[in-house]
Swiss-Prot record:
It comes from Lactiplantibacillus plantarum (strain ATCC BAA-793 / NCIMB 8826 / WCFS1). It catalyses: tRNA(Asn) + L-asparagine + ATP = L-asparaginyl-tRNA(Asn) + AMP + diphosphate + H(+). SUPFAM superfamilies: Class II aaRS and biotin synthetases, Nucleic acid-binding proteins. GO terms for cellular component: cytoplasm. Keywords: Aminoacyl-tRNA synthetase, ATP-binding, Cytoplasm, Ligase, Nucleotide-binding, Protein biosynthesis. It is found in: Cytoplasm. Its main location: cytoplasm. Belongs to the class-II aminoacyl-tRNA synthetase family. The keyword Secreted does not apply. InterPro entries: Aa-tRNA-synt_II, aa-tRNA-synth_II, aa-tRNA-synth_II/BPL/LPL, Asn-tRNA-ligase, Asp/Asn-tRNA-synth_IIb, NA-bd_OB-fold, NA-bd_OB_tRNA. This is Asparagine--tRNA ligase 1. The gene is asnS1. Pfam families: tRNA-synt_2 (PF00152), tRNA_anti-codon (PF01336). Its EC number is 6.1.1.22.
Length: 431
């Protein structure tokens, strides 16, 4: 008799197997019991008959509490009525770990209660489906970039400078020096691009933002490619190809998870159609003003403006060439306009706003020094970064994509906290 995982049930129809499971739920009519069993790979139904198990064993089985762990032995049968397509006719079982008063029951719970019990909530069907989609997106990220000749480099988490030049930093003592939890791996990524041509960093980043919006976490994962010898137009092509690739990967490999989340696949499929529309910041301002928005040139867009623009185009949309005053110091100046930089944000529809921000990077040593000084930065902190412009600088571009924002859009979640295993937010660092 073989020990299998539920996900492989199709390969063992009409065979007797053994599976290690947790009991998610159960119901019994007195002579027959239906048990929802999960093993981490999938969930399906186990069926136990009183006249086959015997009265004592049947009573013990039907008395088991939610989240009891056990070995079950039985025969796999195809079942077209089951969402999974298969069920287990249980002939034997062995309790491994008991469970008493499991706090997350089928009834509704408030979000604070669920987050306090996140270590257990991950077992429930919706969080479980989201984490599986997260895993698929991460897998597809590596596949996308590896297939295109990118090298992954690992940027440090502890840094002595801030790439965005902000004050939203987690500060710590580093043997008598000030150090910060990284907000971005981008500057190190640029160094990597000068060594390897095309690179990506992918890891946790930290923002000490005292924000309670549905789009912010204090710790999140960010994907940041940097590409030498590449201008902005070419970078935009990489960005839209990436989004379409990741969306298609989820459609192809996570149909059950999308069904659990009630995510419409046809809508997702529409978002894989390329190219994405492009609109200049100037034209976006004009469009917003024509539709009743009180916005002036030079402001950064908030959630209402981003939502309108993406819904107007009914697709992810690139907004190009933002005002220099609202963008980071490292962005390439526009060739004909002093007030604009060659930057772009990708806005997702359905109210999710910016999911990618990118730009062509400045290659001008003196311009970068001027921008750093204007933002109040200490040039000594950035000496190594400025060195990149002194020794064979080339045109290069890059972008950043927040994994959790992307996942919130793909899985249609109201808050990014749903898309990371253990969210870190203002006033929440437990569990």
């Amino acid at each position: 008799m073989e020990t299998i995982s539920i996900i492989n049930a199709a390969d063992h129809v009409n065979e007797q197997v053994k599976i290690g499971v947790w009991l998610s739920n159960k119901r019994s009519s007195g002579k027959i019991a239906f048990l929802q069993l999960r093993d981490g790979t999938a969930t399906f139904q186990g069926v136990a008959l009183k006249n086959e198990l015997g009265e004592t064993a049947f009573a013990q089985l039907t008395d088991l509490a939610q989240e009891t762990s056990l070995w079950v032995t039985g025969t796999i049968h195809a079942d077209t009525r089951s969402p999974f397509g298969y069920e287990l006719a249980i002939s034997q079982f062995e309790v491994v770990g008991t469970s008493h008063d499991y706090p997350i029951t089928p009834k509704d719970h408030g979000i604070d209660f669920l987050l306090d019990h996140r270590h257990l909530w991950l077992r429930s069907s919706r969080p479980n489906a989201i984490m599986r989609i997260r895993n698929e997106v991460i897998r597809a990220v590596y596949e996308f970039f590896n297939d295109r000749g990118f090298i992954k480099i690992d940027a440090p988490i502890l840094t002595g400078s801030a790439p965005e030049g902000t004050t939203e930093l987690f500060k710590t003592d580093y043997f008598g020096q000030d150090a910060y939890l990284s907000q971005s791996g981008q500057l190190y990524g640029e160094a990597g691009a000068m060594a390897f041509g095309k690179i990506f960093t992918f890891g946790p980043t930290f923002r000490a933002e005292k924000s309670k919006t549905r789009r912010h976490l204090t710790e999140f994962w960010q994907l940041e490619p940097e590409m030498a010898w590449m201008h902005q137009d070419e970078s935009l092509e990489v960005q839209e190809q990436l989004v379409a690739y990741l969306g298609q990967a989820v459609i192809d490999h996570c149909p059950h998870e999308l069904a659990v989340l009630d995510r419409d696949v046809a809508t997702l499929q529409k978002y894989t159609k390329l190219p994405f529309p492009r609109v200049s910041y100037d034209d976006a301002i004009t469009l917003l003003q024509a539709n009743g928005f009180d916005v002036d040139w030079g402001v950064d867009f908030g959630s209402p403006e981003e939502t309108f623009l993406a819904e107007h185009f009914d697709q992810p949309v690139f907004v190009l060439n933002y005002p220099k005053a609202i963008k980071a110091f490292y962005m390439q100046a526009h060739p004909t306009r002093d007030d604009v930089v060659i930057a772009a944000d990708l806005l997702a529809p359905e109210g999710y706003g910016e999911i990618i921000g990118g730009s062509e990077r400045s290659t001008d040593y003196d311009y970068l020094k001027e921008r750093l000084l204007a933002s109040g930065q200490d040039l000594q902190d950035y000496e190594w970064y400025l060195d990149l412009r002194k020794y064979g600088s080339v045109p290069h571009s890059g972008f950043g994509m927040g994994l959790e924002r992307f996942l919130a859009w793909i899985t249609l979640q109201d808050h990014v906290r749903e898309t990371i295993p253990f969210p870190r937010m203002l006033h929440r660092i437990y569990p």
